[in-house]
UniProtKB/Swiss-Prot annotation:
Organism for this UniProt entry: Francisella tularensis subsp. holarctica (strain LVS)
Protein name, entry field: Iron-sulfur cluster insertion protein ErpA
PROSITE patterns with a match to the protein in the record: HESB
Superkingdom of the organism of origin: Bacteria
Assembly behavior: Homodimer.
Residues annotated as binding iron-sulfur cluster: 44, 108, 110
Classification of source organism: Bacteria, Pseudomonadati, Pseudomonadota, Gammaproteobacteria, Thiotrichales
Length: 116
């Protein structure tokens, strides 16, 4: 496990995202939970973003902590997410987590898949 403690994280876990995750963890009543962000094959552009709650920190995980909430990213996914923003939006389109990834060459219309 690598824990990021520098002032500028390689992945920006936004204030809005960390506070929403904190709220969801409190609703679950399990403070051992973290938000895992990972990349899988699929989607209309080749790669897809995925989110899951996890209470296990794996050896190759990058851990970014904000507002007492941990964001976990495995080493394979990390290479595609360096420089990205993990954010939470609540607007007229709905409420959802979103990733803004400067490494993505193309993204699909819904924003959940990308290519590099």
């Amino acid at each position: 496990m690598s824990e990021v403690v520098q002032s500028v994280d390689p992945i920006n876990f936004t204030e809005a995202a960390s506070l929403k995750v904190k709220e969801l963890i409190e609703e679950e009543g399990d403070n051992s939970l973290s938000l895992r962000v990972y990349i899988t094959g699929g989607g209309c552009s080749g790669f897809q973003y995925a989110f899951a709650f996890d209470n296990e920190v794996k050896e190759d995980d990058m851990v970014i902590t904000k507002n007492g909430v941990r964001l976990l990213v495995d080493s394979m996914s990390f290479q595609y997410l360096v420089g990205a923003d993990v954010d939470y939006k609540d607007d007229v389109e709905g409420a959802y987590f979103v990733i803004r990834n400067p490494n993505a060459k193309t993204t699909c219309g819904c924003g959940s898949s990308f290519s590099v």
